[in-house]
Amino acid sequence: MRYLPKSPADREAMLREIGAASIDELFAIIPEEFRLTRDLAIPRQMGESEIVDHFQAAAARNANGYASFLGAGAYRHYRPVLIDTIVQRGEFLTSYTPYQAEITQGTLQAIFEFQTMICELTGMDIANASMYDGSTGAAEAVMMAIRVTGRDKVLVSRSVHPEYREVMHTYAQHQGHDAAEVEYIREGAQAGRVDLAALEAAVTEETACVLVQSPNFFGVIEDIPAIAEIAHKKGALLIVSIAEALSLGAVRPPVEADIVSLEAQSFGVALSYGGPYCGVLAAKEKYLRQMPGRLVGETKDSQGRRGFVLTLSTREQHIRREKATSNICTNQALVALMATVYMTIYGKQGIKDLALQNLAKADYAAKTLGQSGKLLFAGSPRFHEFVLETSETPAQVNERLLEEKIIGGLPLGKWYPELGHAALWCATEVTTREQIDRAAQVLAHAPALAAR
């Protein structure tokens, strides 16, 4: 972005135009304690050659060559180069919403195909393409369930991603809705899953919905049919949040759910230091008119030709704000296009094969790394993440791993105090056996777990 300076004369002219006598008067509404009265503490200006040297030195500090075992909702997968080749075409590379169907058929068709693929993956009837990410998708799903049922109490499993829960609580509390959390099972054959007995005791005729994640934050696959039976018995809706879309290549889709919230970052969307990601909402057809965001439908023009248009748009830009189902309005179509290209490249069998490869890599990693610690929730089915408890704290383990250019698992104690010595590890198709073996060698030099 260019820097466009303003001369004193420019400032005076602008102040006269808005009727302010001075800059101080313009900013008078801002309390004194929040106003900066000194010059910014920035370094001196640099010449061109100095700027080049500065950024070359910064680039040299990049973490190239590091093996990473981080997951927790943001996953490292291989991105085919064809994805950027397609999305960078001028016809697609825009943040503009495709309102004018007569000139945006390509974009609309791509969104329609994305919605179709998501429905095939999730087992739902309808899908949109315009949530910011998995967390806002889950929160919007909860708001949707409240509108559908007319109830205002929400139950969420504590095994749902902590940051997803934080976003959901933010939505709920500021709209006057009550959201309570249900514990997960700590020990036994069902460890890591939501406690079904506690859930059944908590669901009442006032419960709008039950929100679970599968695979959940611990990587464990939930018993969706059993959870659905408990929720539906009291007239509550079941929302299933999926933070790892690739799991649907190997895991049975949550067809018993009423609403599915999906994070599709794994489908060709780069990690990008946290976003933009690809949030999706899918649901049963009977809830169509309560879907937030935009939907693309198939139609015919005046000459009988197949075409695509935005339909049932209940965003605040289309209808009265008080009638809108959501105020999320950023155009996520370009990110959805990345996922569409990714799914098209791999196809149904390719996604299944890739999911099974992730499963195998994680199984090898769990068995290998588990020799130097204790695998928690080992009796429950999982996808490509697992929880490993060690004698050292995760911070100590990760410090030693970093010396070997390895980024270890995510410490869980921040959100789960009872798991202070445990970390969440992830392995995908880009994780090599050599990397797993190197990490295992570092862990093997830690004190024995029994000594803690």
UniProtKB/Swiss-Prot annotation:
Superkingdom as given in the UniProt entry = Bacteria
InterPro entries according to UniProt: GcvPA, GDC-P_N, GDC_P, PyrdxlP-dep_Trfase, PyrdxlP-dep_Trfase_major, PyrdxlP-dep_Trfase_small
Keywords, sorted A to Z:
Oxidoreductase
Q: Which GO terms describe its molecular function?
A: glycine dehydrogenase (decarboxylating) activity
Keyword Oxidoreductase tagged = yes
What is catalyzed by this enzyme? N(6)-[(R)-lipoyl]-L-lysyl-[glycine-cleavage complex H protein] + glycine + H(+) = N(6)-[(R)-S(8)-aminomethyldihydrolipoyl]-L-lysyl-[glycine-cleavage complex H protein] + CO2
Q: Which GO terms describe its biological process?
A: glycine decarboxylation via glycine cleavage system; nucleoside metabolic process
Q: What is its EC number?
A: 1.4.4.2
Which family does the UniProt entry place this protein in? Belongs to the GcvP family. N-terminal subunit subfamily.
Q: Subunit structure of this entry?
A: The glycine cleavage system is composed of four proteins: P, T, L and H. In this organism, the P 'protein' is a heterodimer of two subunits.
What functional role does this protein have? The glycine cleavage system catalyzes the degradation of glycine. The P protein binds the alpha-amino group of glycine through its pyridoxal phosphate cofactor; CO(2) is released and the remaining methylamine moiety is then transferred to the lipoamide cofactor of the H protein.
The record ties this protein, via HAMAP family, to: GcvPA
Name recorded for this polypeptide? Probable glycine dehydrogenase (decarboxylating) subunit 1
Give the organism, scientific name. Answer: Acidobacterium capsulatum (strain ATCC 51196 / DSM 11244 / BCRC 80197 / JCM 7670 / NBRC 15755 / NCIMB 13165 / 161)
